[in-house]
């Protein structure tokens, strides 16, 4: 595998239009269940668990770099100031000159203020140019021969992605045991993935009885001398009964008899992806040998630490190896298993043709249509054992992923916000069997979100970056 910190690969990947576009979809919020404001994150997590669960979680929007107030971008302010300066200068010269400068100022004000489908005109032009660049690249790029068919759709989204295995040996009772951890990166980051499951119990507890502790996830942003880029939580849900079953089928009738049958998933997988930027954690990487080996060791340290904490919190945690990681990417992409199996042995390369396509409103893989939304507004969230908010986090996730879709995906990425807060960025993706079904599912999800106060913005012209943000790769950055 090429070096994850090679300067050439870093510059190539950072120039990708899709990654730049994904960065624009990021939102900083300071309302995570346990924002880490102290250097000692273990202490902060303990304080949050003991004394921070008395009331609902207030979600506050923090301005990100280049954003003033909450709505006005720095570039918009510059355009407004330039327009005002032109009018003032023209007025001091003469009225005819002021009239000419006023016309130019009017154009600048239109560019700065007038929205186009929720974006300023310069931003809309940049987004459209990035989409054209991705489409042009898609016409010429195919995964190389020998690519695993399960990984090929992800490579069509981000050609620089590579997977690898980091092997370690542990001594158990005088007997060395080899452990393998799968990692994925594109030259600018390296990620490992955990599969988190509830422990087997004779009676399954209620959905809200043991939610995944977000304070523990946020505490993994800094472990020892290692600072992660982000921690991503991904929940992939397939509904029950299957949407294609007739209403009078035995399975459909059985689920209707359940008290909460419409919210009962057939499959719900939870992954936690840990994303390391070797440049951000340069000191920790150098302390462990530098280069790709040092980055792998640093990521392995954080992965083991978080797995241990989640196990102590009452969950079964599995660190995915390389094959399991590729399978997780395929499941999250909702690829057609028949299409993947049909390419086994063919190499999945240039002879198999391209399997994905991005349109203005959808991303298609095989015969599945995906529509991705960015969470633009959060409701007041409640905590278990405390004063209720408008809705609890498990109920919110269950509501937006409970549509009768082929699959639904919820992604929550925690990163470093302003003033030592935790930045949260959320995305929702629904998958249908056709374009018309995806449209209907999108409307249903939008209506469900609106009923709770959750704001969803469909990522028109940015569906490919949106899908990348919902795959267990560590989140958009």
Predicted region positions:
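Membrane-embedded segments
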Residues: 213-216, 228-231
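A short acidic (Asp/Glu
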Residues: 205, 239-248, 283-284, 329-333
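Membrane-proximal, solvent-exposed terminal domains/tails of membrane-associated proteins
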Residues: 2-3, 254-477
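Structural flexibility/helix-modulation signal
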Residues: 229-266, 271
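Short secondary-structure junctions
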Residues: 222-228, 402-405
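N-terminal topogenic membrane-targeting module
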Residues: 111-213, 222, 449
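Short loop/turn segments at secondary-structure transitions that flank enzyme active sites
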Residues: 200, 237-239, 276-280
């Amino acid at each position: 595998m090429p070096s994850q910190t090679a300067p050439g690969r870093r510059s190539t990947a950072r120039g990708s239009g899709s990654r730049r576009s994904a960065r624009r979809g990021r939102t900083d919020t300071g309302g995570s269940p346990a924002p880490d404001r102290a250097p000692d994150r273990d202490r902060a997590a303990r304080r949050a668990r003991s004394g921070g669960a008395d009331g609902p979680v207030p979600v506050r929007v923090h301005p990100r770099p280049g954003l003033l107030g909450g709505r006005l971008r720095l570039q918009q302010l510059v355009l407004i100031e330039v327009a005002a300066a032109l009018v003032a200068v023209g007025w001091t010269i003469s009225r005819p000159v002021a009239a000419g400068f006023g016309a130019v100022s009017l154009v600048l004000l239109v560019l700065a203020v007038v929205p186009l489908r929720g974006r300023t005109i310069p931003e809309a032009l940049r987004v459209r140019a990035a989409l054209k660049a991705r489409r042009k690249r898609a016409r010429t790029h195919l995964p190389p021969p020998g690519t695993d068919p399960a990984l090929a759709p992800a490579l069509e989204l981000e050609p620089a992605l590579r997977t690898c295995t980091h092997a370690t040996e542990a001594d158990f009772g005088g007997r060395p045991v080899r452990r393998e951890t799968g990692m994925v990166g594109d030259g600018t980051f390296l990620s490992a993935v955990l599969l988190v499951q509830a422990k087997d119990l004779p009676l399954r507890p209620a959905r809200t009885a043991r939610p995944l502790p977000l304070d523990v996830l946020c505490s993994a942003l800094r472990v020892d001398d290692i600072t992660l880029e982000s921690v991503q939580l991904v929940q992939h849900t397939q509904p029950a009964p299957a949407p294609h079953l007739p209403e009078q089928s035995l399975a459909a009738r059985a689920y209707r008899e359940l008290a909460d049958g419409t919210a009962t998933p057939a499959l719900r997988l939870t992954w936690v992806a840990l994303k390391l930027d070797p440049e951000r954690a340069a000191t920790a990487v150098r302390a462990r040998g530098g280069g790709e080996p040092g980055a792998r060791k640093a990521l392995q340290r954080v992965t083991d630490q978080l797995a241990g904490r989640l196990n102590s919190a009452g969950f079964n945690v599995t660190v995915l190896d390389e094959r399991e990681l590729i399978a997780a990417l395929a499941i999250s992409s909702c690829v057609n298993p028949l299409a993947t199996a049909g390419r086994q042995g063919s190499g999945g390369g240039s002879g198999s043709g391209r399997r994905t396509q991005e349109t203005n409103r959808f991303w298609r893989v095989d015969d599945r249509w995906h529509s991705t939304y960015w969470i633009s507004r959060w409701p007041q969230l409640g905590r278990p054992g405390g004063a209720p908010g408008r809705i609890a986090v498990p109920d919110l996730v269950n509501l937006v992923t409970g549509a009768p879709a082929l699959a639904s995906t919820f992604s929550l990425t925690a990163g470093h916000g302003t003033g030592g807060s935790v930045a949260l960025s959320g995305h929702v993706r629904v998958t249908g069997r056709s374009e018309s079904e995806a449209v209907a599912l999108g409307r249903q999800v939008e209506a469900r979100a609106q009923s709770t106060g959750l704001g969803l913005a469909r990522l028109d012209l940015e569906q490919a970056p949106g899908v990348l943000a919902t795959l267990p790769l560590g989140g958009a950055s």
